[in-house]
Amino acid sequence: MAGKTTGVVAAGHAQTAEAGKCMLEEGGNAFDAAIASVLAACVVESSLTSLGGGGFLLAQTAAKKSYLFDFFCQTPQVNPGEKAVDFYPVALNFGGAWQTFHIGKGAIAVPGMVAGLFAAHRKLGQLPFKVLIEPAVAYARQGFTLNRFNDFTNGLLEPILTQQEEGRKFYAPQGKILRQGEKAYLPQFADVLEQLARHGPDWFYRGELTEWVLESLGEASALTAKDWADYQVEIRLPLRAQYRQRQLLTNPPPSAGGILIAFALQLLEKYDLSQYPLGSAAQIQLFSQVMALSNQARRQYLDGNLHCGDIEAKFLGGDRLASELGQSKFINKLGSTTHISVLDGEGNAASLTSSNGEGSGHFIPGTGIMLNNMLGEEDLNPQGFYQWPPGQRLSSMMAPTILLDQEQPRLVLGSGGSNRIRSAILQVVCHHLDYQLPLAEAVGRERIHWEAHKLDLEPTSVADILAQLRFDDGTQGTLWTEQNMFFGGVHGVATTTAGTMEGVGDPRRSGAVAYSLE
């Protein structure tokens, strides 16, 4: 790289990262870059995120102020019951293993993405919103070439992406799903972005686009004009926790991912990890037990209590190690989520995670926007489908995270991957801080995930690793033959001890990095 680095963006696609870099070079800050990047991701990673979904932005400003923008999806204000709406299963083929998801118009929750991006821009942005949309508009109109990960996600989600003619126009314009090396175009989405830049979020929530949405949904959804008009972004104080003399900032309740990461780190802080060589059976056993205890704590203390005002103090304040393990819930093999991390030269840090679920299969007519299926996500509905409280923010495992050293951003990261989000972030934090691996190696190092008495391990150099592990709870181990997106996609940026900036995109999900230069 020639010239001085003035910022770095890590994301799930090279063009997503490039969009953020362009904003930094235009004089924007980390928050401008994050917004431009996620708008670009709605084009080049559209099977993972969408203006029809939601997410979270964790912001640490150069003035040492921190904010968590919660723009995740909201349940409708009236629950008509599952039988009253268009809500049905669809089976997806994960290369020999089939899994069922629930989609349809009745699976759609109120999307928060548009409101959230405008709220963050109003509070923290520097560049005009019309500038932030420019990369996404260019990608949508001029087209972009599908990469290997686009090919995988499009192929996997084909039954959902092609449910309607609107989806087939974009994802299968010649009758077959677009594949790697082919070019995709989304000109209607470019028009939507320009309308949003001109009219603001009211056009989406109270205006012409709202009419299009509700007319297309008809009686098949629980959503009403009031649901859309009443949507509010929640600006929360991030959850703060200590780990090895550093401050951890992450997503607070009512989302579960951040508090579970803080809980796991609290458990690990009791151990001198230098006595547990990275990759050894002892280290894998320890981390597996920590993950198991975190899952147990979620079931016993969090599920059903995430909207209680004192849940942080109660959950992180006591010793839960003696609790009994129960049976864990469903595992989402994909985790249709993407993440963006940004550092700028002024000391601002942005960590933004967003998702559309698997998508509902329903597109807003004439826009190229597929709406979410959050009401059909089993891990977001632990009490069962259509048991949700009306008018309430859904919980999430998304956990944008920032680690501070003397109130300065040291590490900014997040991940996709549903229930593996927290285990992926936990391991990268420990690889980088405890084991002092360079960020690229910390992200690239093999990972594990424990869930439902099943331990999944990426390939390791330790011979017969499964034979060396001992579990008394019936846990069964599976050693994968190669690294896989199942284990998350951690995209992170950091400041080095020399004061320079570095970034890493997780190769498991075709991650990429872009640096802005003077």
From Swiss-Prot:
Subunit structure: This enzyme consists of two polypeptide chains, which are synthesized in precursor form from a single polypeptide.
NCBIfam families: g_glut_trans
Post-translational note: Cleaved by autocatalysis into a large and a small subunit.
InterPro entries: GGT_bact (IPR051792), GGT_lsub_C (IPR043138), GGT_peptidase (IPR000101), GGT_ssub (IPR043137), Ntn_hydrolases_N (IPR029055)
Top-level division of the source organism's lineage: Bacteria
Family: Belongs to the gamma-glutamyltransferase family.
Keywords: Acyltransferase, Glutathione biosynthesis, Hydrolase, Protease, Signal, Transferase, Zymogen
Active site: T337 (nucleophile)
Lineage summary: Bacteria, Bacillati, Cyanobacteriota, Cyanophyceae, Synechococcales
UniProt key word Lipoprotein: no
EC number(s) reported in the record: 3.4.19.13, 2.3.2.2
One GO-annotated biological process of the protein: glutathione catabolic process
Pathway involvement of the protein, from the record: Sulfur metabolism; glutathione metabolism
Keyword Protease in record: yes
Catalytic activity: an N-terminal (5-L-glutamyl)-[peptide] + an alpha-amino acid = 5-L-glutamyl amino acid + an N-terminal L-alpha-aminoacyl-[peptide]; glutathione + H2O = L-cysteinylglycine + L-glutamate; an S-substituted glutathione + H2O = an S-substituted L-cysteinylglycine + L-glutamate
Organism: Synechocystis sp. (strain ATCC 27184 / PCC 6803 / Kazusa)
Protein name: Glutathione hydrolase proenzyme
Molecular function (Gene Ontology), one example: leukotriene C4 gamma-glutamyl transferase activity
